[in-house]
Amino acid sequence: MTWIRRCLTLTMALLAAGAWLPADARVQTSPDADAERAVRAIVAEQAEAWNAGDGRRYAAHVSPEVSFTNLFGMVMYGAPAFTERHVEILSTFYKGTTKRHVVRRVRFLTPDVAIVDIDNELRGVGAMPAGIPTPPDGIIRTQLMEVFTRRDGRWVIEAYHNVDVKAR
C-alpha cells in the first residue's frame, strides 16, 4: 500500500509541476539543436510552397513511402500520390489560399526521429468539392502531425496526418 501511495504522490507531483507550462511549450529531447532547426525549416518551406501554390515544392521532403491522411479522411501512400494530390488541390479548390501555421511541439523520439505537431489555418477558402461543406468564414483550421526521419543526413516526412479542428 505504501508503494502505491508513493507512486500516486510522485505522479501527482509530476502532473502539478507540468501544469504551469504554456500550451505551446516546446519539447526538446534532441541533443542536436541543428536537427530541430532543420525540421522547423522544412515546415516553414511547406508553408511558403503552399502560399505560392506549388504542390511539387510542398511535397519535396516526403519520403518515397510516406503515409498520408488528409482532413477529409482520405488515406494515401507514397510520394507520387502525396505530390499529385497537392498539385491538384493547390490548382483547384485551395488555389489562392494562404497557409499559416504554429509549430506547437517538436519531440524527438531518437536523434533521427521527430514528431512535429502543427496548428494550421487556411484562409481564403472558397467553394469546396461536392459533399464537403464550405467554411462560412473562409477559414479551415487543422491539426497536422508530421513524423520526420533523418535518412543519410537528410530529413524526410514519413507520415503526414491532418485532422479538422473546429473553432473554439
Regions found by a protein language model. Give the residues of each.
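Short, compositionally biased low-complexity segments
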Residues: 18-21, 57
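A beta-strand edge to alpha-helix "cap/lid" segment located at domain peripheries
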Residues: 26-44, 48-60, 67-168
